[in-house]
Amino acid sequence: MLLPADQPGVVAPFDDVTIELCKSNPDVMIMTADLQPYVDIFQVPKERPKQFLDVGMAEQNLLSIGAGISKAGFIPIATTFACYASRRAFDQMVICMGTGPRTCVVIGFTPGITSPARIHHQSTEDLAMTRAVPHATVIDPVDATEFTQAVRASVTQPGLVYMRGLRGTVARLLDPDRYVFEIGKTYCLRDGGGPGIIATGAGTEWAVEASRLLERAGIDHALLHVPTLKPARHEEIWRFCEGRSRVFTIENHNIVGGLGGLVAEIMADRGGGPRLTRLGVPDHWAPGGSLGYIRKSLGLDAESLARQIKEAA
């Protein structure tokens, strides 16, 4: 399922999948809030202008209008930065989109610490917020293969779907000929004994980097990818944890309420489990700067992650 290291990236996969969806389904409406080139929307406005709507720099309007057109039979895919989709327009996401059965897709780009602009544009709490919305679907894709398939799946999912978006040249980790995304499903990327690593989104990319370092060091371990944080298959995650002495979660998110919170809840519900270490953004504001700098300052670079896991082996 995992491709060899150093695969060429995929340029603007969101642009390709949205034009594909619009051509196959005239009810799909691609929406944005004055961020068209920054969320990789290029082909739809030119080729399917009646299926594109830019509401201007007004994220609350973006989601409330999206909810409104869903009642007229459209399938909105509303795009903006994750910080705006979650923090600025959360009330509209919950009340307008989240309380009905109609499909409403919200895609938040530059999630977590992937923005260099510090807290103004970083979104390290969006997964925790959206996980708490009743009946919502929450997806954090790892690469171009998964992101493309998840967008396709989202337009057939009833109710609110919140997904983190990937833009620009997006990494390719998963083999598109072998990988099949399914909402809720988990994916074992490395089987083994010893410490277990559970990751999601960009955290899975970082976990794969650390896993390769651990392999070179002869450290046995296992790696589970959890792209859907809600609805998650708790039993699959529990089976992965069961029988291990240590489990680590790795995520591009605050350690409160995201993947680490999900795994902790599963263990608590079952009354035990291995010792859990949550690796992500600690309970303080992340710095600004390049992604490499931010990761290293938070102990999320491959070497730091591998060292922490190796010490527990």
Each language-model region and where it sits:
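Thiamine diphosphate
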Residues: M1-R164, T169-V170, V180, ...
